[in-house]
A protein has these predicted regions:
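Residues lining hydrophobic/aromatic ligand-binding pockets adjacent to catalytic sites
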Residues: 1-293
């Protein structure tokens, strides 16, 4: 077996009100959530740029706040104007987003730029033209593409990503008709996986956005992902992001994966050293449906 490259595992985001007193210890006054989590994980996916392009002062601050962890690298979502809501895109947004990325890249703290597209985005010549344009706009940064429609899961599209030097994002999500299925595909500069949970009941029928991400994976459900991650890491530096963030469930599962892959890991805050504490925080048990291995 070839040598395993580095595997960084961590949550999507760090600023959630429902993490207070669970992921983060009870505190008064100022508390640096990012710095705290960077003592437990070597990566975190930055969510906030999806909603608004941050100024470079934000990325410079984030770099400073993880300085105590030499191994730490961020991944970051791209602004939704490039992928979801084109009407929100303004002249100068490419330059503004690159200016935000530069402090991360120059500090050696940028693992990947996540280009996340919705399920409604399907493979077609027009879609590939859209993607090629976007790849060119952010040339020079390590890019990873998340698509969720099954039409993209073909050898021709893998070749397309390899030609452009862009990573495929392997996804775990509820499997509906024409959903992308779990895989261990590696293209581009890094291996990348995102685990969103399997909350079938609330994935589309939710009143609050957090509801679809309220899901705690069992260790049995994570076992196939341990194998996939190990396979991905034979080829590339790999990032694994747990996005089932509600009430810290992403933290528990990130620690589960780290331990299963032989990495030292401990649970932060008041989570305790088992899944019972966080699962008891959920409003109700999530109905289980098996995803294919």
């Amino acid at each position: 077996m070839s040598e395993r490259h580095s595997i960084r595992i961590g949550p999507a985001g760090w600023s959630y009100k429902d993490w207070e007193g669970i992921v983060y210890p009870p505190h008064r006054g100022r508390f640096d959530e990012l710095a705290y989590l960077a003592s437990f994980f070597d990566t975190i996916e930055i969510n906030s740029p999806f909603y608004r392009i941050p100024p470079p002062t934000h990325s410079k601050s984030w770099v400073r706040r993880v300085a105590h962890n030499d191994a730490f690298k961020f991944t970051t979502k791209i602004f939704k104007g490039f992928t979801h809501e084109k009407a929100e895109l303004k002249p100068g947004d490419v330059d503004a987003f690159r200016a935000y990325l530069d402090p991360l890249a120059e500090a050696g703290r940028l693992g990947a730029l996540l280009l996340q597209f919705p399920w409604s985005f399907k493979d077609s010549p027009e879609s590939r033209e859209t993607l090629a344009t976007l790849f060119g706009q952010f040339a020079g940064y390590p890019q990873a593409l998340e698509v969720r429609h099954a039409t993209f899961q073909n050898e021709g599209f893998v070749d397309f990503l390899n030609e452009h030097g862009v990573s495929w994002v392997n996804v775990d999500q509820p499997l509906f008709h024409e959903s992308v299925k779990p895989a261990a595909t590696v293209t581009g500069p890094v291996g990348y996986a995102r685990l969103h949970g399997r909350n079938y009941e609330k994935w589309f029928a939710h009143s609050e956005s957090w509801e679809r991400y309220s899901y705690l994976y069992s260790k049995e459900e994570l076992e196939p992902w341990v194998e996939r991650i190990d396979e991905m890491a034979q080829a590339k530096e790999t990032y694994v992001i747990t996005n089932n963030h509600f009430r810290g469930q992403a933290i528990v599962n990130a620690v589960d994966l780290k331990r299963a892959l032989g990495q030292e890991a401990k649970l932060p805050g008041t989570l305790g050293d088992n899944q019972a504490n966080v699962s008891s925080q959920s409003d109700s048990p999530t109905p289980r449906r098996k995803n294919p291995k």
